[in-house]
Regions:
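Class I S-adenosyl-L-methionine-dependent methyltransferase catalytic core
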Residues: 1-187
Length: 187
């Protein structure tokens, strides 16, 4: 795996921890091409962060700050290593916690986000994801427009989304389906 574009372009990321399925370079490249205008200066939340490849791509492309969340200590260590490799650690926070527990904390201590990236294991149930999506809620999202990106297996069920969200775009890369959600008024 490597960083596709931006300040860390071409830098190789470290080994993938056991049980982590990172988004392919091709899918990341396509996704971030679609998000080209949203990433610069964005505050980003990377849930189910794994190796951190999605959030690191956002940082490399000019995101102001990324909060990485993964429940695995091995994944958190890999994220720290990859942030050091790419020299992007100064604009990142790594939290070792379950995604649902992280979004359930009240009040949000990490501010509001312009972009939320979710790349859960394909076997995470749609109902579990619905809890996480509800937990993201309006108090965690920017008032000036936001995008939530969910990666699922093409054979995985997709969650029911909050009523004020709309599917803005769907992208398919091999066995991955990438869904971009936006607030109804912004879609």
């Amino acid at each position: 795996m490597r960083v596709i574009a931006g300040s860390a372009k071409g830098m190789r990321l470290g080994p993938v921890p056991p049980g982590v399925r990172p988004v392919s370079d091709r899918a990341r490249e396509g996704l971030f091409s679609s998000l080209a205008l949203e990433v610069p200066d964005a505050r980003v939340l990377d849930l189910y962060a794994g190796t951190g490849s999605m959030g690191i791509e956002a940082l490399s492309r000019g995101a102001a700050h990324v909060v990485f969340v993964d429940r695995s200590y091995e994944a958190s260590a890999a994220i720290h290593d990859n942030l050091d490799r790419t020299r992007l650690a100064d604009r990142a926070t790594v939290v070792t916690e379950d995604a649902a527990a992280f979004v359930a904390q009240a009040p949000p201590t990490t501010g509001r986000f312009d972009l939320v990236l979710l790349d859960p294991p394909y076997d995470v149930s749609a109902s579990s994801l619905e809890d996480v999506l509800r937990g993201i809620g309006p108090e965690r999202l920017s008032d000036l427009g936001w995008t939530v990106v969910l990666t699922r297996g093409v054979k995985s069920s997709t969650p029911v989304i909050p009523i004020d969200w709309a599917v803005a775009r769907q992208l398919r890369y091999g066995d991955s389906l990438v869904i971009l959600y936006r607030e109804v008024s912004w879609a």
